Amino acid sequence: YPAADSPIVPEENIIIGNTVLYGAISGETYFRGIAGERFAVRNSGAATVVEGVGDHGCEYMTGGCVVVIGSTGRNFAAGMSGGVAYVLDEVGDFEKRCNLAQVELEPVQAEDVSDVALKRDDLSEVMSDMLRGDARRVRVMIERHALYTGSTRARLILENWVKYLPRFIKIMPVDYRRAVREMEATAEEPQPLAVAGE
């Protein structure tokens, strides 16, 4: 994030260059400002919050979680085959900038987040089930973003959560969703017991 005495307004300026998080496999990042083009390209496991991205954001992403609390460029999610992204669509035109060849868009459903406890050391609780708990996941990640960067944008969203939550869109690859559901179904099936001597 920019220095405290910097005259720039972070959420209105590109503060990180192109291809940041290229091929990231784990970890967390929080960027107070806008990213250049191809942000999180080939991301396969990192969790991140950014205040806007250029063209081709989340291109060829295979895992991880990206939360964008600003605008995006064109061709978002092109070739995205895994992971989940959330975009704050304040204007209502994100669908025109998203590459829908492999992903589906859905609203983030409201849920009770009053019991969300901010844990500085662990995101695993909200990252364990990418099919459910979207509002909790987004809320925790934005809270961490505010904590680590002092983002005024994040604070505004958190203070007006009921207003902003319906404007978030979840982006999830179709085949990834199907694979996760199949794994869940397999895990729920009773496993036959082996009998000695058979």
Role assignments for model-derived ranges:
Residues 1-198:
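Long, distal/terminal scaffolding or interaction modules
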